[in-house]
Amino acid sequence: MKLSYIDSKYFEELLSLEINPILKNKLISDMCRINILYMICYAGSGHIGSSFSSIDIMNWALGELNKNYEKLYFFSSKGHDAPALYNSLIAYGKLNFSLLSKLRKIDGLPGHPDINTPNIFTNTGSLGMGISKSKGIIKANRLKGINSKVIVLTGDGELQEGQIWESLNRVSQEELNELIIVVDNKKLQSDRTVKITSDLGDIENKFKSFGIETVSCDGNSVEEFSKAFESIESRKKPGAIIANTVKGFGVSFMHGDLLKEGEFYKFHSGSIAQEIFDKAILELNNKITKSIYESKIKFDFKLSFNDSPDIAKKDNIQQSLLSSYSNSIVNEARKNKKIIALDGDLVLDTGLIEFEKKFPERFIECGIAEQDMVSQAGTLAKEGFIPIVHSFSSFLTARPNEQIYNNSTEETKVIYSGFLAGLLPSGPGHSHQAVRDIASMSGMHNLEMIQPNSEKQVEKLLKYSLESPNNIYIRFCSIPFELPDNFDELSEIKKGFGNTISDGKDICILTYSPTILSEAIKSKSLLLKNDINPKLISMPWLNTFDNNWIINELNNFHLIIIEDHYIEGGVAEKLALAISKLDLNIKIDVIGITEVPKSGTNQEILDYHGLSYKKISEKIMGLIKT
């Protein structure tokens, strides 16, 4: 893909000019928009819409407001606008320009802000925490005797998180006058309007009801935003600015306010095609050139060009569990009218579009409110329905963990479908990498954990989940992966039984993740060259193991369990406990994640954490030698 960007020297030149700060901000913001597109398309993923809506505010905060305070903290709580924040920091010389081509690379910029990046103060990506963190910053600086100002940028979708409203309770009471909350009120979250997902009502008066001085303005007009900020600042009280923005602002055909009823927004996340990139760059380039001409300032710039890395094409047939799940849940819902699907603002990412179309009365959109969603599911189950709760695994198993436990104590049945499970995709970063979900769901009463390893297993395991009397957590890999053509012939769904994919001797490799299984299969080829012939087992059951199967399939083997999870709290601990109760000759070693997962390309991260097929082979050979 042919990409264009604006070199750092033009930002430096523009910043050196003595011109109207509002004009300067407009020019810098549109120049940043060009570089945001470059950054996201070079990386292959990122969030364009949210970055475009907030870049004007970010540049005003970092470029102008930063001059007015002894110590200014500005950060975004919503995280999706990381490319905007990075480009703003680059524009003002607070990040190295070379990082423009390093988004979602292991040696560059993570998908969501992380404190290991220069001038990033706090980690974001898990929503709802920003105001609480701001309060802690203010109190810490008061104790140190430092005058500080904290500006936290939140999203309107983020306002659905319960922690937001908890964090507002004592802001006025504690006179946290150093705090200004800015809401990026673009009226779109993810792919649909906030009104459809979870209508927020009168946001301004909600904030006012907490005793917070609140005004609204056009958040994409720096003139209006600067006046709103001055108005709030002059009141010497905790403040909030409802910045009414447009998702995708700056490129006319990306504007979210053009969305028609029933449509999905196309520029929430991901890269874009060459022709769309070229069209957007042309519009931004013309807009910047026109502003320079009309303002008669002595400034000129040129675009630079670069090719994005080629994405390697896969030769083998790839499995996609999402489409299989989408079809399977619709098929089961046709047969069983008690099935209810609950969604946490991830209808595209959890395969529920067709379900919503075909069974709108049995589809419940809960927005970004996992605790509320899980508790609703609990009482739906008590009333005789079969609720299936959907979200990303990292969010579904952590934030509403207490609610899940409460449901389990009521002896009802709820199915929890968690997507984006495991280390990959690694681009979004550790807030989205579910590598502690198995540990989080352990200890739940009457809860089985399962993970399908193929499209056909999705169908079978969903059917099993609906028939089982227990609560079920289904752990879904969300990226395509490769498996042998005969995988489904070799695998069956029998409770507590693993599936032998390839016979071997002495060594047995067991894993439950399809992405890791794919790597393990490739590692066998390398191991065979070193006269090591491992048996390979795919295990769809994460906390249920049949004793007879263990005896027949694992006894007298050196068992190497590969986790797509932290080693602590993973499947290996559970399987080792089951083995310890039997009088068997099994040596156990575990390969898995031992530190906070990195953000980067999938291959980079597999290599870094020792889970690529080459690293697996090296580790196994090392284990055998010892």
Q: What function would you assign to each model-found segment?
A:
Residues 96, 105-178, 347-420, 435, 548, ...:
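Thiamine diphosphate
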Residues 295-387, 394:
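Non-catalytic terminal/interface segments that mediate subunit docking, oligomerization
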Residues 43-62, 321-334:
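Active-site pocket-lining segments that scaffold enzyme catalytic pockets across diverse folds
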Residues 145-146, 195-228, 410, 414, ...:
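Conserved thiamine diphosphate
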Residues 29-45, 184-186:
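N-terminal capping segment at the start of a domain
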Residues 50, 76, 152, 216-218, ...:
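General beta-strand structural signal in soluble alpha/beta enzymes
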Residues 7, 39, 51-173, 494:
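Cofactor-binding active-site loop characterized by glycine-rich and histidine/acidic residues
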